Amino acid sequence: MRILDTASAEYLSAHTGVASRHMVHVIGRNRETGAQEALGLWQGDDHLTIAINGANRTYYGAGGLIGVEPIRAGIGLEVRMLQATLSPLTPEVALLLRGYDTRLAPAEVHRGLLSLETGQLIAEPIRVFRGWVDEVKIKTGEVGGTSEATVTLASAARGLTRALTLTRSDTEMRRRNAGDRFRDYADIAGEVGVWWGEKRERA
């Protein structure tokens, strides 16, 4: 069950209408510097800087984020997929898709509630999805046509399906501790005969 702040709970319970915008935040690796950099997009008309969990984030508007498909919530460990449609013609989206390596990049989707009178956010946006970038597809339109990009996100449950990458080879153990020789002969252990309480036969 999602716990809402007081302002959001009162807004939704008023039954006078709801105005909301989605926000997508991705942390990708800069292809030139190798540094991890964050980039946010939202459905608003202007750029926005807002505190999320105590840290300021900048979300770029003006058409970069076209839309997010309906989010399906549920109980369990099922990996859920979510698609966001972007406009590759905006500089921020072009940077995200071509300037960053977004393979398995951490991503979050928030939902911001807007005042019906002022059009401003009434409270800190509510996180509605968290996971990783699973796939990016770019569709380039013909002359006079429409171009768009589709980013598919996999929910955080995907982390439970990852295999353990750490091996117990001698090389891996020495990488962690150069003096660790516990598995010095691990690669030939199955080929060496062992005699327990028996007379060893000579070859």
Predicted segment positions?
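Polar/acidic, low-complexity leader/linker segments enriched in S/T/G and N/D
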Residues: 1-61
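Short amphipathic beta-strand and strand-loop transition segments with alternating hydrophobic
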Residues: 68-73, 135-141
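Envelope-exposed proteins and targeting segments
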Residues: 80, 129, 147-149
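Short, solvent-exposed secondary-structure boundary/capping segments
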Residues: 138-153
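Intrinsically disordered, low-complexity terminal/linker regions enriched in Pro/Ser/Gly
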Residues: 158-203
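Extracellular/virion structural assembly segments
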Residues: 70-106, 113
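Outer membrane beta-barrel transmembrane domains
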Residues: 64-66
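Short, acidic/charged, Gly/Pro-enriched secondary-structure junctions
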Residues: 3-4, 8-10, 94-134
